[in-house]
Amino acid sequence: MVKHTKSKNDFDAELLLSETSKIGDPWVPIYQTAVDIEAHHFETAMSNLIKQPNINSTVIMRADILKENVFDVENGDSTFVSKLINKVPEFPSENPDDVILHRYLDDIDLRTISLNNSELKLNTKCEVVRRIIPRNPFKDHIINQTCLVLSSSNADPESHTEKESDDSVLVVYIPHIQSSDEIPFYLPPVYGVGILYHKSTLSIQYLPFNYQNYKTSPEIQLSLRNLDVTERPIRIALRLLQTSSKHSLGAKSGYEKRVNHDLVVPKIAFQNRYITLKKKYSSNLVNSWCESTDPKKHVFEDLAIAAFLIELWTVKYKSREDFEFRDLGCGNGLLVYILNMEGYSGKGIDARSRKSWSTYPENVQNNLSEQIIIPSVLLKPHPALSRLIPNVTDNFRYFQAPQLPSKNNCSCEAENVPADDKSTSHTNSSSTLTTYSSANLLESSQVCTTEEFPPNTFIIGNHSDELTCWIPLLGYPFMVIPCCSHALSGAKVRYSPRKQQKSNQQQNVSTYGALVDHTEDLAKQMGWIVEKEMLRIPSTRNAAIIATKRQPHCIDENDEVTQTRVLDILALEGGAEGWVENSINLMKKAPRNH
């Protein structure tokens, strides 16, 4: 017996290739490890892994459960059949050469195995047929697979011991294929995989193809027993053992998921859309990337966000003609490009143009604007003053900031902000300061107040930094993905945890979590009905705050009441003094890379 140590995480496993399987020939044991768990911990963990095979392999996107039979001695049997059982997964593509790979999807009959030679008496407790969807179904085949859970406690309930560690549980995976050369890359090249819990030990067992003939053809088993530990089937076995051990220990310790996904947009719809977009755009975008940032991170993240937005809009709007988007702080413009190319009307705005902008088609370039966002509430008169003097259009304020550039590099050229007749400029150690009036800024084509947006605008804030907390205050439906924490003045800030959390959870609330909560609270103060989704994107900052509807008492609120509400929030937040100056300064700074 050879001991194999995984030093990366101190995981010890014993290699069993020369041993006899406890579930009998023709099974071949591969690895085993000792675990301090009981049978129900293993069952709980494996129930989750059956539903989420992507935990075992990054090649797999998800599993769709097609049918499930549960045999419960105490509570009775139950059966589930999915509406997806007779549907082939769809990944719309305009390219006729894009062919989805799949095998025998109409084969939904449960597989069974013989354990006639087993030392253990096991009966079926649960049987599942799942459909495995790989991340790239244009490269890896979609297949159906039987998953069986067998238990000694189901075999003879009367002889069931009180000491649950004496129970044995076997989980078996059997792909629905007809020959060994049809096995997909993400599975080991065997007829079946067994994961066995027995006497505080977990082990991985392989059932070879043509196992029925193992007595007359010894090479059937020898082909597995002679494998080297570096070969892929053995490495997969170790991975399966590590995962089942880790998740079983997690079940014992009472591990609960920290976040719940797919609360707003169905997982299947999002993932199918993501696969389609990735196939359509990823290769070209990664290969032609001209920014200094990591292309794979930005490309795949924005493809995932685009997929989520498209499916969100499918849920919230009747058609794509019912709205148009504005991506505030759009950065490299990639999200705007993807959405425009998919037929969605909208524009992106950022204080600084990027190299990428000039690489997009002309129609996309025309939808990218180099502007700063100064919400109109900071430049217009108070509603009370507007009632008294209707002709007044600005609040008579003056701001000192560096001179805005006379030209920008984006496709939509903007003019200089005209300085007030009485403005002065002087040389500072770092730059020349110019005085701007609120009237100047309201008239400038380099300033976006958001008031010019059409009424059916949907605002996107994708890691939009200083704009994060402003977006819920602008009066349009939105989705904002917070990133860096800034106050309404544009200054960096660390928000405190919510008051109700301070008594027992304050130590668990991160700076990012506090920012997300604060953004959500601002939206609620503005009368929005807020939804929250933890996006499936390659980023730890993946919380999305979404609002498309207002509370009933705010639906018919007039502009004056809304503006007063914003001003009240500004006062509670400590004001927005410095926002104008900080925004103008952004046009002088180098873009952030995140």
From Swiss-Prot:
Keyword Cytoplasm belongs to the record: yes
Family annotation (Pfam families): AdoMet_MTase
Gene Ontology annotations for the cellular component aspect, listed alphabetically: cytoplasm
Recorded catalytic activity of this chain's protein: uridine(44) in tRNA(Ser) + S-adenosyl-L-methionine = 2'-O-methyluridine(44) in tRNA(Ser) + S-adenosyl-L-homocysteine + H(+)
EC number: 2.1.1.211
Family note: Belongs to the TRM44 family.
Function statement: Probable adenosyl-L-methionine (AdoMet)-dependent tRNA (uracil-O(2)-)-methyltransferase.
Disulfide bond annotation, renumbered to this chain: none
Keyword Hydrolase applies: no
Keywords: Cytoplasm, Methyltransferase, S-adenosyl-L-methionine, Transferase, tRNA processing
Span of the signal peptide: none
Entry protein name: tRNA (uracil-O(2)-)-methyltransferase
GO terms under biological process: tRNA nucleoside ribose methylation
